[in-house]
Amino acid sequence: MTIEATEGHVSKGMLAKGDSTSPIPTIFDVLSRDHVFVDSHQKVWWERTGQLLDKILASAGYNPARRLEALTFYIQVLIPFLGPHPHQFRSAITRSGLPLEFSVNYQQRGDIDPVVRIGFEPVAAASGTEIDPYNQIPVVDLLNQLEVLNIPAFDPSLFRYFLDAHTVNGHEKGLLKEKKIEGSELTSQSAFGFDLKEKAISVKGYTFPAIKCTLNEKGFGNFISESIQPLAAQMGPIPSFDMVHSYLEGTNGYSQFAFWSFDCVDPAQSRLKLYSSHNSVVWSKVEEIWTLGGRAKSPVVQEGLVYLKELWELTKLSEGHREFNGGFDDGKDATATPMVWNYEMKIGEAFPLTKFYFPIHGESDQNVIGGLAQFLSRIGLSKYGDNYEATVRHYLYDFSTSPVPCKNDSIANFDSPERDLSKTARLTSWISFAYTEKTGVYLSVYYHSSDEYPWLELEEIN
């Protein structure tokens, strides 16, 4: 991934024409100067996250016009839905509880530029309180706002349907006041994904039905099956779900933290994804998951498995059992990270597509980033792999040199020294890996997405 010496990446010696002291302003700088923030919380969220997003966009090859478009969407549409700062409600979409996560997707074939994505759970001041204990109000509010933005091909109908089918209702929230459910500290019920593609933003929805399943004493697989049956007339048959359900039922593969995803497009065109997790982080389990216990045997599946094992070895992932019980790892609470995967299902297709998520949160960033750099170069993406380590260091400056902020001040200090990756283990969060004949390797890297790094003292001790 090449660091551009353009508006997004200005060296200290690169100065504006006719000015011997002022650096060229970035897209982030321009928006920071011109935007009127409703309150100090929004301003701090922008300062702590916006410049990182600008850097990621630039390094992924987004030209200034595309970066301006993406950052304008972020500052105008998403920033108002991040709620109070510092965040009080802990979101299930990240290990730290942060309600957003930036990632970059790479595709081996097709000469496709990287795509920057944002995982996002909208939050408000009432999130997690008695007013909105399961953070459901901001999700509907953001969905309503997206509907009036005229995003090409955006269709909220599946999101609204699954919100009703998969998330706790008023009666169930009353029962939850009286009945403690294991894992219920993960109270998130739904979230969004935004792919910042060249021609339009692509929107995905996520639901987290685990609490509703457990409360109603239903198995996750049967619960999902019942929820998609009413859609059959509108969407068509989904035979791949039967294969997925058979494998997961036979191997006790439905985790209590399983969740669901879909594209916010015409339901007949949407992909459906079933996510699960496992605490046994060993290659033999990965191979079983990838092939659905031997049910998927095509040459393409086997080719993908070879690449998957190569990346597994290059990242030097620690193998063994990880005691994940649904908690967070945010500098206060510490829990290990499990393996996660999803099965992508399309209307009328007999076989699902497996996507595996490497549990790299808590692993050496140096090993992970070094392994990723080698892998990108080996699969023909050397224009990103050759400079990947330098690019990530540029994203994530040395947190230990950041000044302690006053109330409502930004702590961002992007001129501070680059972070020593050999001493960190949580700058990178996940690597997702899929493989198809059309795309070849389809890989995404997820990053801790704020200049606040809550694990600094923990990692200095270790």
From Swiss-Prot:
Record-listed dimethylallyl diphosphate binding positions: 117, 204, 206, 273, 275, 357, 442, 446
Keyword Metal-binding on entry: no
Pathway: Alkaloid biosynthesis
Keyword Transferase: yes
InterPro entries with a match to the protein in the record: Aro_prenylTrfase, Aro_prenylTrfase_DMATS, DMATS-type_fun
Positions bearing the site annotation: Required for regioselectivity: 119
Assigned keywords, A-Z: Alkaloid metabolism, Prenyltransferase, Transferase
Protein's UniProt name: Prenyltransferase phqI
CDD domains reported for this sequence: PT-DMATS_CymD
EC number(s) recorded for this UniProt protein: 2.5.1.-
Gene that specifies this protein: phqI
Species per Swiss-Prot/TrEMBL record: Penicillium fellutanum
A Pfam family of this chain: Trp_DMAT
One GO term of the biological process aspect: alkaloid metabolic process
Entry's Gene Ontology molecular function annotations: prenyltransferase activity
Protein origin, superkingdom: Eukaryota
Its job: Prenyltransferase; part of the gene cluster that mediates the biosynthesis of paraherquamide, a fungal indole alkaloid that belongs to a family of natural products containing a characteristic bicyclo[2.2.2]diazaoctane core. The first steps in the biosynthesis of paraherquamide is the production of the beta-methyl-proline precursor from L-isoleucine. They require oxidation of a terminally hydroxylated L-isoleucine to the corresponding aldehyde by enzymes which have still to be identified.
Family listed: Belongs to the tryptophan dimethylallyltransferase family.
Annotated residues for binding of brevianamide F: 101
